[in-house]
Amino acid sequence: MGATVVIGGFFGDEGKGKIISYLAQKDNPTIVVRGGAGPNAGHTIKDGDKTFKVRMLPSGFLNKTSRVMIGPGVVVNPDVFLKEINDFATEGRSFLDNNCGIIEQHHLEADSKGRLKEKIGSTGSGTGPANAERAMRTLKMAKDIESLEKYIIDVPQELNSALDKNENILIEGTQGTHLSLWHGTYPFVTTKDVTASGICADVGVGPKRIDDVIVVFKSYLTRVGTGPMTGELSAEETSEKGWEEFGTVTGRLRRAAEFDFELASRAIMLSSANQISITKLDVRFPNCAGAQSFDELDSESKLFIKNIEDKLGVPVTLIGTGAGVNDVIDLRT
Protein backbone atom coordinates (compact mmCIF):
# COMPACT_ATOMS: atom_id res chain seq x y z
CA MET A 1 0.00 0.00 0.00
CA GLY A 2 1.20 3.53 -0.65
CA ALA A 3 1.10 6.35 -3.18
CA THR A 4 0.78 5.91 -6.94
CA VAL A 5 1.14 8.84 -9.34
CA VAL A 6 -0.42 8.74 -12.81
CA ILE A 7 0.79 11.24 -15.40
CA GLY A 8 0.48 11.85 -19.14
CA GLY A 9 3.50 11.16 -21.33
CA PHE A 10 2.69 13.15 -24.46
CA PHE A 11 0.54 16.30 -24.92
CA GLY A 12 -2.45 15.28 -22.81
CA ASP A 13 -5.46 13.30 -24.05
CA GLU A 14 -3.60 10.03 -23.43
CA GLY A 15 -6.47 8.37 -21.57
CA LYS A 16 -5.41 9.15 -18.00
CA GLY A 17 -9.03 9.50 -16.87
CA LYS A 18 -9.84 5.93 -17.88
CA ILE A 19 -6.71 4.50 -16.24
CA ILE A 20 -7.22 6.48 -13.03
CA SER A 21 -10.87 5.40 -12.88
CA TYR A 22 -9.81 1.78 -13.35
CA LEU A 23 -7.14 2.02 -10.64
CA ALA A 24 -9.57 3.74 -8.27
CA GLN A 25 -11.93 0.79 -8.52
CA LYS A 26 -9.32 -1.96 -8.71
CA ASP A 27 -6.93 -0.75 -5.99
CA ASN A 28 -9.59 0.91 -3.80
CA PRO A 29 -7.56 3.91 -2.59
CA THR A 30 -8.68 5.78 0.50
CA ILE A 31 -8.11 9.07 -1.32
CA VAL A 32 -7.87 10.09 -4.97
CA VAL A 33 -6.32 13.53 -5.30
CA ARG A 34 -5.86 15.77 -8.31
CA GLY A 35 -2.86 17.95 -9.06
CA GLY A 36 -2.17 19.99 -12.19
CA ALA A 37 -3.00 23.45 -13.44
CA GLY A 38 -6.81 23.74 -13.26
CA PRO A 39 -10.02 23.08 -15.24
CA ASN A 40 -8.20 23.56 -18.55
CA ALA A 41 -7.71 19.78 -18.64
CA GLY A 42 -10.67 17.44 -19.05
CA HIS A 43 -10.92 13.70 -18.53
CA THR A 44 -13.55 11.54 -20.26
CA ILE A 45 -14.72 8.38 -18.49
CA LYS A 46 -17.07 5.75 -19.88
CA ASP A 47 -18.67 3.47 -17.30
CA GLY A 48 -21.26 1.13 -18.76
CA ASP A 49 -23.76 3.23 -20.71
CA LYS A 50 -22.73 6.45 -18.94
CA THR A 51 -20.08 8.91 -20.11
CA PHE A 52 -18.63 11.46 -17.69
CA LYS A 53 -16.59 14.52 -18.67
CA VAL A 54 -14.64 15.80 -15.69
CA ARG A 55 -12.71 19.06 -15.40
CA MET A 56 -12.22 19.63 -11.66
CA LEU A 57 -12.85 16.52 -9.58
CA PRO A 58 -10.42 13.60 -9.74
CA SER A 59 -11.44 10.89 -12.20
CA GLY A 60 -11.51 8.33 -9.40
CA PHE A 61 -14.86 9.60 -8.13
CA LEU A 62 -16.56 6.46 -9.52
CA ASN A 63 -15.32 4.58 -6.46
CA LYS A 64 -17.97 5.63 -3.98
CA THR A 65 -15.82 4.71 -0.96
CA SER A 66 -12.89 6.94 -1.96
CA ARG A 67 -12.63 10.53 -0.86
CA VAL A 68 -11.76 12.86 -3.74
CA MET A 69 -9.60 15.92 -3.22
CA ILE A 70 -7.99 18.80 -5.09
CA GLY A 71 -4.48 19.78 -4.03
CA PRO A 72 -3.37 23.32 -3.11
CA GLY A 73 -1.40 23.73 -6.34
CA VAL A 74 -4.56 23.64 -8.48
CA VAL A 75 -6.62 26.70 -9.41
CA VAL A 76 -10.35 26.07 -9.08
CA ASN A 77 -13.44 27.41 -10.79
CA PRO A 78 -16.02 27.24 -7.98
CA ASP A 79 -18.94 26.96 -10.42
CA VAL A 80 -17.37 23.95 -12.15
CA PHE A 81 -16.37 22.35 -8.84
CA LEU A 82 -19.84 22.67 -7.29
CA LYS A 83 -21.59 21.55 -10.47
CA GLU A 84 -19.49 18.39 -10.68
CA ILE A 85 -20.18 17.54 -7.05
CA ASN A 86 -23.89 17.76 -7.87
CA ASP A 87 -23.70 16.03 -11.26
CA PHE A 88 -21.55 13.13 -10.04
CA ALA A 89 -23.20 12.78 -6.61
CA THR A 90 -19.99 13.19 -4.59
CA GLU A 91 -21.36 15.42 -1.83
CA GLY A 92 -19.80 14.53 1.52
CA ARG A 93 -16.59 13.09 0.08
CA SER A 94 -15.30 15.94 -2.12
CA PHE A 95 -12.75 18.38 -0.73
CA LEU A 96 -10.26 21.03 -1.76
CA ASP A 97 -7.37 22.70 0.01
CA ASN A 98 -7.79 26.18 1.44
CA ASN A 99 -4.79 27.30 -0.62
CA CYS A 100 -6.33 26.44 -3.98
CA GLY A 101 -6.42 29.57 -6.12
CA ILE A 102 -9.75 30.79 -7.47
CA ILE A 103 -10.68 31.46 -11.10
CA GLU A 104 -12.98 34.47 -11.49
CA GLN A 105 -14.88 35.95 -14.43
CA HIS A 106 -12.09 38.32 -15.42
CA HIS A 107 -9.73 35.35 -15.76
CA LEU A 108 -12.16 33.65 -18.15
CA GLU A 109 -12.41 36.80 -20.24
CA ALA A 110 -8.64 37.31 -20.39
CA ASP A 111 -8.13 33.68 -21.42
CA SER A 112 -10.61 33.86 -24.29
CA LYS A 113 -9.01 36.60 -26.36
CA GLY A 114 -5.71 38.03 -27.52
CA ARG A 115 -2.38 36.20 -27.63
CA LEU A 116 -3.37 33.34 -25.33
CA LYS A 117 -6.25 32.37 -27.59
CA GLU A 118 -4.78 33.20 -30.98
CA LYS A 119 -1.16 32.08 -30.68
CA ILE A 120 -1.02 29.56 -27.84
CA GLY A 121 -4.46 28.06 -28.45
CA SER A 122 -5.59 28.41 -24.84
CA THR A 123 -8.66 26.46 -23.71
CA GLY A 124 -10.32 29.64 -22.40
CA SER A 125 -10.82 28.16 -18.92
CA GLY A 126 -9.16 31.07 -17.10
CA THR A 127 -6.43 28.80 -15.76
CA GLY A 128 -3.48 30.68 -17.25
CA PRO A 129 -4.48 34.18 -16.12
CA ALA A 130 -5.36 32.85 -12.65
CA ASN A 131 -1.97 31.18 -12.28
CA ALA A 132 -0.27 34.36 -13.50
CA GLU A 133 -2.12 36.33 -10.84
CA ARG A 134 -1.15 33.74 -8.27
CA ALA A 135 2.51 34.26 -9.13
CA MET A 136 1.94 37.97 -8.42
CA ARG A 137 0.38 36.99 -5.05
CA THR A 138 -2.87 38.81 -5.77
CA LEU A 139 -5.14 35.82 -6.49
CA LYS A 140 -8.10 35.00 -4.26
CA MET A 141 -7.86 31.68 -2.46
CA ALA A 142 -10.47 29.03 -1.67
CA LYS A 143 -10.51 30.11 1.97
CA ASP A 144 -11.87 33.49 0.77
CA ILE A 145 -14.95 31.97 -0.92
CA GLU A 146 -17.97 31.39 1.33
CA SER A 147 -19.63 28.81 -0.94
CA LEU A 148 -16.56 26.56 -0.64
CA GLU A 149 -16.23 26.72 3.13
CA LYS A 150 -17.69 23.28 3.91
CA TYR A 151 -15.44 21.57 1.35
CA ILE A 152 -12.14 22.95 2.64
CA ILE A 153 -9.67 20.54 4.19
CA ASP A 154 -5.90 20.36 4.75
CA VAL A 155 -5.16 18.14 1.75
CA PRO A 156 -1.41 17.52 2.38
CA GLN A 157 -2.17 16.59 5.99
CA GLU A 158 -4.93 14.17 4.95
CA LEU A 159 -2.73 12.50 2.34
CA ASN A 160 0.28 12.07 4.58
CA SER A 161 -1.86 10.86 7.47
CA ALA A 162 -3.35 8.21 5.18
CA LEU A 163 0.14 7.11 4.14
CA ASP A 164 1.21 6.98 7.80
CA LYS A 165 -1.62 4.47 8.32
CA ASN A 166 -0.38 2.42 5.35
CA GLU A 167 -3.43 3.33 3.30
CA ASN A 168 -3.46 3.54 -0.47
CA ILE A 169 -3.70 6.92 -2.23
CA LEU A 170 -3.90 7.70 -5.94
CA ILE A 171 -2.43 10.96 -7.26
CA GLU A 172 -3.88 12.16 -10.55
CA GLY A 173 -1.89 14.25 -12.98
CA THR A 174 -3.38 16.31 -15.78
CA GLN A 175 -2.38 17.23 -19.32
CA GLY A 176 0.94 15.72 -20.49
CA THR A 177 4.68 15.91 -19.91
CA HIS A 178 5.41 17.87 -23.07
CA LEU A 179 2.96 20.59 -22.04
CA SER A 180 5.00 21.23 -18.88
CA LEU A 181 5.94 24.87 -18.38
CA TRP A 182 9.50 23.76 -17.57
CA HIS A 183 9.98 20.77 -19.86
CA GLY A 184 7.51 21.21 -22.71
CA THR A 185 7.45 22.85 -26.14
CA TYR A 186 7.57 26.42 -24.82
CA PRO A 187 5.72 28.72 -25.41
CA PHE A 188 3.07 26.19 -26.45
CA VAL A 189 2.68 24.83 -22.93
CA THR A 190 0.48 25.00 -19.86
CA THR A 191 1.08 27.23 -16.83
CA LYS A 192 2.56 24.60 -14.49
CA ASP A 193 4.97 21.70 -14.36
CA VAL A 194 2.93 18.54 -14.97
CA THR A 195 5.66 15.92 -14.55
CA ALA A 196 5.35 13.56 -11.57
CA SER A 197 7.41 15.81 -9.30
CA GLY A 198 5.24 18.81 -10.16
CA ILE A 199 2.02 16.91 -9.54
CA CYS A 200 3.32 15.64 -6.18
CA ALA A 201 4.24 19.19 -5.18
CA ASP A 202 0.72 20.31 -6.16
CA VAL A 203 -0.85 17.94 -3.64
CA GLY A 204 1.78 18.07 -0.90
CA VAL A 205 3.33 14.59 -0.99
CA GLY A 206 7.13 14.29 -0.88
CA PRO A 207 9.05 12.17 -3.41
CA LYS A 208 10.17 9.55 -0.88
CA ARG A 209 6.55 8.60 -0.25
CA ILE A 210 5.84 7.61 -3.85
CA ASP A 211 5.81 3.88 -4.65
CA ASP A 212 4.89 3.89 -8.34
CA VAL A 213 4.87 6.39 -11.19
CA ILE A 214 2.68 5.27 -14.09
CA VAL A 215 3.11 7.19 -17.33
CA VAL A 216 0.21 6.93 -19.77
CA PHE A 217 0.78 6.89 -23.52
CA LYS A 218 -1.86 6.52 -26.19
CA SER A 219 -1.01 4.05 -28.96
CA TYR A 220 -0.68 7.08 -31.24
CA LEU A 221 0.06 10.74 -30.63
CA THR A 222 -2.48 13.57 -30.48
CA ARG A 223 -2.35 17.25 -29.62
CA VAL A 224 -4.94 20.01 -29.25
CA GLY A 225 -4.05 23.53 -30.31
CA THR A 226 -0.82 24.95 -31.66
CA GLY A 227 2.77 23.87 -31.14
CA PRO A 228 5.31 21.57 -32.80
CA MET A 229 4.44 17.95 -33.54
CA THR A 230 6.85 15.70 -35.42
CA GLY A 231 5.34 13.61 -38.19
CA GLU A 232 1.93 15.26 -38.01
CA LEU A 233 -0.66 13.55 -40.20
CA SER A 234 -3.09 15.40 -42.43
CA ALA A 235 -6.76 15.48 -41.47
CA GLU A 236 -7.43 12.99 -44.26
CA GLU A 237 -4.74 10.58 -43.03
CA THR A 238 -6.01 10.87 -39.47
CA SER A 239 -9.53 10.06 -40.60
CA GLU A 240 -8.37 7.09 -42.68
CA LYS A 241 -6.62 5.59 -39.66
CA GLY A 242 -9.70 6.12 -37.47
CA TRP A 243 -7.75 8.41 -35.14
CA GLU A 244 -10.13 11.40 -35.22
CA GLU A 245 -10.69 12.79 -31.72
CA PHE A 246 -12.05 15.99 -30.20
CA GLY A 247 -10.86 17.76 -27.04
CA THR A 248 -12.91 17.23 -23.86
CA VAL A 249 -12.76 20.91 -22.86
CA THR A 250 -12.40 22.68 -26.22
CA GLY A 251 -14.25 20.36 -28.60
CA ARG A 252 -11.49 21.06 -31.12
CA LEU A 253 -10.21 18.37 -33.49
CA ARG A 254 -7.00 16.86 -32.16
CA ARG A 255 -3.97 16.75 -34.41
CA ALA A 256 -2.45 13.27 -34.78
CA ALA A 257 0.84 11.50 -35.47
CA GLU A 258 2.48 8.12 -34.97
CA PHE A 259 3.72 6.99 -31.54
CA ASP A 260 6.79 9.08 -30.72
CA PHE A 261 9.51 7.09 -28.94
CA GLU A 262 11.74 10.12 -28.41
CA LEU A 263 9.00 12.01 -26.55
CA ALA A 264 8.07 8.87 -24.63
CA SER A 265 11.64 8.23 -23.52
CA ARG A 266 12.04 11.79 -22.28
CA ALA A 267 8.74 11.63 -20.38
CA ILE A 268 9.94 8.50 -18.58
CA MET A 269 13.25 10.16 -17.73
CA LEU A 270 11.67 13.36 -16.40
CA SER A 271 9.29 11.53 -14.05
CA SER A 272 11.31 8.40 -13.18
CA ALA A 273 8.34 6.34 -14.37
CA ASN A 274 8.54 2.65 -13.47
CA GLN A 275 5.37 1.55 -15.25
CA ILE A 276 3.79 2.32 -18.63
CA SER A 277 0.12 2.28 -19.52
CA ILE A 278 -0.84 2.08 -23.19
CA THR A 279 -4.37 3.19 -24.08
CA LYS A 280 -6.54 2.89 -27.18
CA LEU A 281 -4.74 -0.21 -28.40
CA ASP A 282 -8.10 -1.23 -29.86
CA VAL A 283 -8.19 1.91 -32.03
CA ARG A 284 -4.85 1.03 -33.57
CA PHE A 285 -5.55 -2.73 -33.64
CA PRO A 286 -9.34 -3.27 -33.79
CA ASN A 287 -8.97 -7.05 -33.40
CA CYS A 288 -7.96 -6.60 -29.76
CA ALA A 289 -11.09 -4.66 -28.76
CA GLY A 290 -12.38 -5.79 -25.38
CA ALA A 291 -9.45 -8.11 -24.64
CA GLN A 292 -8.96 -8.83 -20.94
CA SER A 293 -5.70 -10.79 -21.09
CA PHE A 294 -2.44 -10.47 -22.99
CA ASP A 295 -2.99 -13.89 -24.55
CA GLU A 296 -6.12 -12.57 -26.28
CA LEU A 297 -4.10 -10.02 -28.28
CA ASP A 298 -3.13 -10.79 -31.86
CA SER A 299 0.54 -11.08 -32.84
CA GLU A 300 0.69 -7.57 -34.31
CA SER A 301 -0.53 -5.84 -31.14
CA LYS A 302 1.72 -8.03 -28.95
CA LEU A 303 4.69 -6.99 -31.07
CA PHE A 304 3.70 -3.32 -30.70
CA ILE A 305 3.69 -3.66 -26.89
CA LYS A 306 6.98 -5.60 -26.85
CA ASN A 307 8.61 -2.98 -29.05
CA ILE A 308 7.59 -0.24 -26.61
CA GLU A 309 9.03 -2.18 -23.66
CA ASP A 310 12.26 -2.97 -25.50
CA LYS A 311 12.85 0.58 -26.73
CA LEU A 312 11.84 2.36 -23.52
CA GLY A 313 13.15 -0.13 -20.96
CA VAL A 314 10.06 0.09 -18.75
CA PRO A 315 7.34 -2.57 -18.43
CA VAL A 316 3.88 -2.03 -19.88
CA THR A 317 1.57 -2.98 -17.02
CA LEU A 318 -1.83 -1.60 -18.07
CA ILE A 319 -3.28 -1.82 -21.59
CA GLY A 320 -6.53 -0.12 -22.62
CA THR A 321 -8.54 -2.22 -25.08
CA GLY A 322 -11.80 -0.30 -25.23
CA ALA A 323 -13.65 2.82 -24.15
CA GLY A 324 -15.02 1.35 -20.92
CA VAL A 325 -13.31 1.78 -17.56
CA ASN A 326 -12.85 -1.98 -17.21
CA ASP A 327 -11.59 -2.57 -20.76
CA VAL A 328 -8.09 -3.02 -19.38
CA ILE A 329 -5.46 -5.75 -19.44
CA ASP A 330 -3.78 -5.55 -16.03
CA LEU A 331 -0.29 -7.08 -16.05
CA ARG A 332 0.76 -5.82 -12.62
CA THR A 333 1.96 -8.52 -10.23
PLM features per residue range, with description:
Residues M1-T333:
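Non-transmembrane, aqueous-exposed alpha-helical and coiled segments at domain scale
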